[in-house]
Amino acid sequence: MKNPEKPLLLFLILASSLASMATAKSTIEPCSSKDTCNSLLGYTLYTDLKVTEVASLFQVDPVSMLLSNSIDISYPDVENHVLPAKLFLKIPITCSCVDGIRKSLSTHYKTRTSDTLGSIADSVYGGLVSPEQIQVANSETDLSVLDVGTKLVIPLPCACFNGTDESLPALYLSYVVRGIDTMAGIAKRFSTSVTDLTNVNAMGAPDINPGDILAVPLLACSSNFPKYATDYGLIIPNGSYALTAGHCVQCSCVLGSRSMYCEPASISVSCSSMRCRNSNFMLGNITSQQSSSGCKLTTCSYNGFASGTILTTLSMSLQPRCPGPQQLAPLIAPPDNVPKELMYLPSPSPSPSPEFDDIAGGGSSIAAVPAASPGGATVSSSNSIPGNPANGPGGSISIASCPLSYYSFIALLIPIGSCFFVF
């Protein structure tokens, strides 16, 4: 007599094996407070999309998204510019503490015709989330059939690690590993080291697989604004920009240093006074005067935004010698295409050369000469942006996240800690 349980047992073993083959790892940061931090998502466009359409996918400000990628916002109608498929962007998000771990739940998605949880996770959001994670985040909604217009919460990975990496200011990027990536290539691309990446992600060995999500520390400039300022804690990664004070102020991280430089933004909005009190200095003005005793510097600096007022500080200092001009990251023109010959190269170095600077991470690289304004003039670069992981950030853990796709034969969710496996 045949054992009816044997085929079922073999079936479950096979299903389990297939599921484990599709398992990806991600780093989770435990937390206990209600504080938030700025974080970044590494996102590769799955199709041509307008700037506003990309921003809408993540419910972020389109102008801030452009500046996070050093894209010039002075171009006419830049928010409706069509960005090419395969372009890699850094998406600025707010990282919260939810159910004891760091994640972002501020992104919502309305389903469209032919959507599945798999296509939403793998295609629309580029593997930053799994179908199972979407299902868990929307457990009160019947997802057996996705009706057009169903509103879904999209849980996205993020990390804070106290805004530091090896005791230096840092912002963390959630990066989805591609098939051609190596740890050395990722480390080189984002100006870090394999050892640091391994420590931050609590990896026993620097082994990665496609679909893994790494927390990548980006060196940054931190602010020192008063706690009552709405932009208290602003941190900007090197080579990027940030808008603050209601789009009135544009800040950057000076290349080769940890100094944040702020000046009036290049977009037209109604703003409060940007003049330093009891002076003729405007926000961002710096003067130097060399004398026999040294260099006298006078600076009108940004000090935060509070109650609709732009706070400024006038400071004077004496230094041994006068500093050279600010070395700020070049702004680039809104990209129209992604060079095919660069689309599938391994992660390149972020170090600028005379011809290229990489902004197209997961998909490709784009020429990053200073952007030419619509009138033909060159736009001067006038700004930039932004774990205690000497032995890895305290409390960071690597776990196996959920499989990236469903298996059609049976859907059996087995919760294990913070992860769900689908057989």
UniProtKB/Swiss-Prot annotation:
Domain LysM: 107-154, 173-216
Listed SMART domains: LysM
Keyword line: Cell membrane, Disulfide bond, Glycoprotein, GPI-anchor, Lipoprotein, Membrane, Plant defense, Repeat, Signal
CDD domains tied to this protein: LysM
GO molecular function, one term: peptidoglycan binding
Propeptide: 395-423
Location of this chain's protein in the cell: Cell membrane
Gene ablation phenotype (knockout): Impaired sensitivity to peptidoglycans (PGNs) leading to higher susceptibility to infection with virulent Pseudomonas syringae pv. tomato DC3000.
UniProt-listed Pfam families: LysM (PF01476)
Gene3D superfamilies: LysM domain
Glycoprotein in keyword set: yes
Disulfide pattern: 31-97, 37-160, 95-158, 97-160, 221-253, 248-276
Function: Required as a cell surface receptor for peptidoglycan (PGN) elicitor signaling leading to innate immunity. Plays an essential role in detecting PGNs and restricting bacterial growth (of Pseudomonas syringae pv. tomato DC3000 for example).
Protein name as catalogued: LysM domain-containing GPI-anchored protein 3
